[in-house]
Amino acid sequence: MAVIKMKPTSPGRRAVVKVTREHLHKGQPHAPLLEPQFQKAGRNNNGHITTRHKGGGHKHHYRVVDFKRNKDGIAAKVERIEYDPNRTAHIALVCYADGERRYIIAPRNLEVGATLLSGAEAPIRAGNTLPIRNIPVGSTIHCIELKPGAGAQIARSAGASATLLAREGTYAQVRMRSGEVRKIHIECRATIGEVANEEHSLRQLGKAGVKRWMGIRPTVRGVAMNPVDHPHGGGEGRTGEGRHAVDPWGNLTKGYRTRNNKRTQSMIVSRRKK
């Protein structure tokens, strides 16, 4: 893939940086693996906003992605690599030897025609999925399960990966890109390699309208509002907050940790680095 900087033919094109997609499938997606996706627009059944900054956006179908990779011992051939509007990563359509087709998260450097395998006996090769107990220490992995059989939950976005550091008893230690080291059960599955589309982070949207196409509405600063709308609002002319930063409901919103999940606290070996 390559990055293209657009010519400044208009103010909206001047800052645009795109990632090329020549290698992606240019036809329609595989229809049996599509599901309708209804726009909630951040509203509940009463029409009240429950999540701010959401609404509008381009309509698209949901691609059913196989995060479990549980067809063990059956070879799957990569038929094509596709764009998925629901995620930053690309997806690959694979056809198993028994004729079933599934979408998977495309790993880096995956080529059309490659053969993938799942299961404990699968070779250590990019795109193959194995239990962590069968993966060599030091390997780069992605699409990692948190519970055996629950499907991948960690390292699924474009360019994401983690590193298998060690195995101790029934748990392995995995280091995330953030620097956090976490214990994961050795029966959980992971896929070898990194997620494709690693240049996604270099993309620049160029104009506000692209965010609207994505279903993201503007974020208004509290100091620009009236006092009835936000604790930071009001004042004559341009004024500051006049207090510690808070959200529209008066809760402190800067400078403290928000994680509070004692149930899984013991699984974290070391916290992420700031």
Curated annotation (Swiss-Prot):
The keyword DNA damage does not apply. Residues 223-274 are annotated as: Disordered. Keywords: Ribonucleoprotein, Ribosomal protein, RNA-binding, rRNA-binding. GO terms for molecular function: rRNA binding; structural constituent of ribosome; transferase activity. Residues 229-246 have a biased composition (Basic and acidic residues). Signal peptide: none annotated. InterPro entries: NA-bd_OB-fold (IPR012340), Rib_uL2_dom2 (IPR014722), Ribosomal_uL2 (IPR002171), Ribosomal_uL2_bac/org-type (IPR005880), Ribosomal_uL2_C (IPR022669), Ribosomal_uL2_CS (IPR022671), Ribosomal_uL2_dom3 (IPR014726), Ribosomal_uL2_RNA-bd_dom (IPR022666). It comes from the Bacteria. GO terms for cellular component: large ribosomal subunit. GO terms for biological process: cytoplasmic translation. Gene3D superfamilies: 2.30.30.30, Nucleic acid-binding proteins (2.40.50.140), Ribosomal protein L2, domain 3 (4.10.950.10). Part of the 50S ribosomal subunit. Forms a bridge to the 30S subunit in the 70S ribosome. Belongs to the universal ribosomal protein uL2 family. One of the primary rRNA binding proteins. Required for association of the 30S and 50S subunits to form the 70S ribosome, for tRNA binding and peptide bond formation. It has been suggested to have peptidyltransferase activity; this is somewhat controversial. Makes several contacts with the 16S rRNA in the 70S ribosome. PANTHER family: LARGE RIBOSOMAL SUBUNIT PROTEIN UL2M, RIBOSOMAL PROTEIN L2. This is Large ribosomal subunit protein uL2. The lineage of its organism: Bacteria, Pseudomonadati, Pseudomonadota, Betaproteobacteria, Burkholderiales.
